[in-house]
């Protein structure tokens, strides 16, 4: 279950610090580590802790919100356990709700091309009617000391609704 990160600020900070020098988290940290700011509001940045059935924090999800463009960008997604499919399901449901209910019109994010999670991002992009819109080659040096390619993705609400119209009450209302 996704809940406000502000409720678990100390635990999230401690768990994130524990990942700083672990190579498997290099794609989240992008070559450098510092404490994540979890402010006492959620106007520009939405931040969530993911809780398992026992109430343990097993993941963190965040994004920036731009009210002028009604869009979100700059995702942060990290699991503190190796296998966490419920976290992914919760994130996808959150994004689907935001798109289908009209809370946002656009999603953009990037990923390192060789990140194992990128395969999942590509499936999500296809499912949501989005597309890869760019690629930068050898643009970021990560913890492994290598330069990595970055790919950029974009999803528009209207494309999501066309692809997933049967799930979206808002789409049916717009068509009437």
Predicted features along the sequence, with ranges:
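Acyl-donor (CoA/ACP) binding surface of acyl/acetyltransferases
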Residues: 1-18, 47-176
């Amino acid at each position: 279950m996704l809940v406000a990160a502000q409720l678990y600020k100390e635990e999230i900070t401690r768990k994130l610090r524990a990942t700083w020098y672990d190579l498997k988290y290099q794609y989240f940290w992008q070559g450098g580590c510092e404490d994540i700011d979890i402010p006492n509001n959620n106007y520009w940045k939405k931040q969530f802790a993911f809780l398992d059935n026992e109430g343990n924090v097993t993941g963190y999800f965040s994004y920036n919100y731009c009210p002028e463009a009604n869009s979100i960008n700059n995702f942060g997604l990290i699991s503190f356990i190796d296998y966490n499919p419920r976290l992914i399901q919760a994130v996808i449901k959150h994004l689907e709700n935001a798109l289908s209910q009209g809370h946002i019109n656009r999603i953009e994010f990037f990923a390192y091309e060789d990140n194992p999670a990128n395969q999942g991002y590509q499936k999500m992009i296809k499912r949501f009617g989005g597309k890869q819109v760019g690629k930068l080659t050898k643009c970021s040096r990560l913890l492994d000391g290598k330069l990595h390619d970055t790919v950029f993705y974009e999803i528009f609400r209207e494309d999501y609704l066309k692809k997933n119209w049967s799930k979206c009450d808002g789409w049916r209302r717009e068509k009437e």
